[in-house]
Amino acid sequence: MKFNDVYNKHHKIIHHLLKKYNISYNYDEYYQLLLIKMWQLSQIYKPSSKQSLSSFLFTRLNFYLIDLFRQQNQLKDVILCENNSPTLTEQPTYFNEHDLRLQDIFKFLNHRERLWLKLYLEGYKQFEIAEIMSLSLSTIKLIKTSVKRKCQHNFK
């Protein structure tokens, strides 16, 4: 499928996501980044998959936008920490509670479990994770169960 067709049918997803997160200040920049990502996703989409193109694009673009927000916050934190200017250090630093919890969870997971959780949070389906990690679907299900068990045990 040509990207022009994909764009004409699905460009409203980008506008919806930007409106959903109340993006107004850097609207054009985020729009361009999401448009580039949409092109990349249109290249890797497999029509034979069970997921429709629109839901595939929406899910992946949504998580990509969240990743962009996280990168932007990390960049601000690095600038704040590296610059010893009194005006910068007087400003309060806000931590994303979600990121802090993920860091706590990652501490007690092994490498495969961390990779599974990272891919799962990025929106990949179990069969896609199995392909990426080169493991069987049953092994992926065991890893998922192990992660759930560890999370429940450590975060009661």
From Swiss-Prot:
Known DNA-binding region: 126-145
Gene Ontology terms describing biological process: DNA-templated transcription initiation
Pfam family membership, one: Sigma70_r2
Protein keywords: DNA-binding, Sigma factor, Transcription, Transcription regulation
Molecular function per GO: DNA binding; sigma factor activity
Motif (Polymerase core binding): 29-44
InterPro entries per record: RNA_pol_sigma-70_dom, RNA_pol_sigma70_r2, RNA_pol_sigma_r2, Sig_transdc_resp-reg_C-effctor, WH-like_DNA-bd_sf
NCBIfam families documented for this protein: sigma70-ECF
Family: Belongs to the sigma-70 factor family.
Protein task: Sigma factors are initiation factors that promote the attachment of RNA polymerase to specific initiation sites and are then released. Sigma-S contributes to the protection against external stress, thus playing a role in cellular fitness and survival.
Annotated protein name in UniProt: RNA polymerase sigma factor SigS
Source species taxonomy: Bacteria, Bacillati, Bacillota, Bacilli, Bacillales
